[in-house]
């Protein structure tokens, strides 16, 4: 299987670049069966390119499922900053 791993590919990119990147990833998946694994925080981009998600918190899988189930309230419970020591 072909696999592409990307770490925050949306970071620092403008809307036009994000659209082109999303189109490219979707085309590669469709045309050659490329699987893409994203480490990403930009929710609109994730929704555009993914069909499944997994939320990791401190190295543990805390939520996963169909991309349609991924929403702000679900993420908010895991994205709060840790208290200062």
Predicted region positions:
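Short loop immediately C-terminal to the Walker-B catalytic DE motif
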Residues: 10-11
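Helix N-cap at the start of a conserved alpha-helix in ABC-type nucleotide-binding domains
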Residues: 15-17
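H-loop/switch region of ABC-family ATPase nucleotide-binding domains
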Residues: 40-41
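Short, glycine/charged-rich "phosphate-handling" switch motifs in NTP-dependent
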Residues: 52, 64
């Amino acid at each position: 299987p072909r696999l592409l791993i990307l770490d925050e590919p949306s970071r620092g990119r403008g809307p036009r670049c994000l659209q082109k990147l999303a189109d490219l990833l979707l085309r590669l998946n469709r045309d050659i069966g490329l699987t893409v694994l994203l480490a990403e925080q930009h929710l609109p981009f994730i929704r555009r390119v993914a069909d499944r998600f997994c939320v990791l918190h401190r190295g543990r899988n805390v939520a996963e499922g169909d991309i349609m189930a991924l929403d702000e309230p679900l993420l908010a419970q895991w994205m709060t900053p840790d208290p200062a020591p």
